Amino acid sequence: MPAEHAYVPSMPPVTTMTADELLRVQIPDKHVELVRGVLVVREPAGLRHGRVAMELARRLGNQVDAHRLGRVYAAETGFTLAREPDTVRAPDIAFLRRERVPDPEPAGFPNLAPDLVVEVLSSNDRPGEVLTKVADWLSAGTSLVWVIDPERHLGRVYRDDGSEQIVAADQSLDGEDVVPGFSCQLEAIL
């Protein structure tokens, strides 16, 4: 009986990228992140996504500025969550408490997780990928993650203590002890 031989095609080795290398990547009109050393390229978000994210960022920013709570960062702001291999995530909205804002702010990606992260879902987001992002944020030290689903008119709240909550359109997102005094009815931003 002849011996069986499997054919294994020659594949290029997988190369990983670092956060510093990601800073030099320029792909026009694309959203890029680094996930465990692998470059992830996504299409830009649509109009509804942009409006929802901007409206929530505006309201959050007003509260943060009025009470000098810290800083709110817009989409495309990368945060280094892990090293070797590097993970750099860029949420739609991020908040850092005043005492955690780096001074001076680095030109690159800070090695810290925001206190609050907001992800606004787009039609091309896959549930498994979103949950992986949430897990990355929480394991890196984020206290509160809001995932806003404009299509379903609901939000999901994930906390660092492992608790979760669904927020219906007629209910409010609450900043809890992360953004004291902030509350926003979900339907007001949808």
Language-model features, listed with the residues they occupy:
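Gly/Pro/Ser/Thr-rich low-complexity, intrinsically disordered segments predominantly at protein N-termini
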Residues: 1-190
